[in-house]
Structures are given as structure tokens and as C-alpha cells.
Amino acid sequence: MALKEMVGTVVSDKMQKTVVVAVENRFPHPIYQKIISRTTRYKAHDAENHCKVGDRVRIKESPPISAHKRWTVTDVLVKGMKSKEAAK
């Protein structure tokens, strides 16, 4: 079975070597066909602490690293804005 890969946004980087990545899943409602958006948060391993809040990252499924970590950050696709830049 192939390992799953997902793309999401880093929403928290307050832990050491761990980031929380929010992945948005969009799908049509089975009856009404309205597009529904669901967000799932995954804890992912970031060995070098490269990721910051707002970064767009790709995560890949991995063997369990801790009680809640089952994903690893493979690469940073887009760097997020710094908080001072976002305020302008």
C-alpha cells in the first residue's frame, strides 16, 4: 500500500520538532451537492524545526513517532508571511 501524502497549512509550531498542519478537504454533499469544506489537523514531525506558522507544507504518512504523531513534513512548498509583514 502506498504512503498517503497531503498538503496543508501550518497552524502551530509551539512544540519542539512538531508542527500542527491543517488540511482542508472539500467534497460535495451527497444529496444537495453543495461543496462542504472540512478541516482536519494533523501533528507532523519537523526534525529541523524549519516550518513556521502560515507555511504551506507537504506531509507524508510514517510509522508512529509518538502517541499522536503519524506524519512527517517532507517539504515546505510556500513560506508564510511574518507577523510584522501581515500587520501592514
Swiss-Prot record:
GO process annotations (BP): translation
Annotated GO molecular function terms are:
rRNA binding; structural constituent of ribosome
Pfam families on file: Ribosomal_S17
* Record GO cellular component, one term: cytosolic small ribosomal subunit
Please verify whether the record's keywords include rRNA-binding.
Answer: yes
* Keyword terms, alphabetized: Ribonucleoprotein, Ribosomal protein, RNA-binding, rRNA-binding
At the top level, the lineage of the source is Bacteria
Physiological role = One of the primary rRNA binding proteins, it binds specifically to the 5'-end of 16S ribosomal RNA.
Q: Which family does it belong to?
A: Belongs to the universal ribosomal protein uS17 family.
- NCBIfam families the UniProt entry points to: PRK05610.1, uS17_bact
Q: Describe its assembly.
A: Part of the 30S ribosomal subunit.
Name of the protein: Small ribosomal subunit protein uS17
The organism encoding this protein is Prochlorococcus marinus (strain NATL2A)
Q: Which gene encodes it?
A: rpsQ
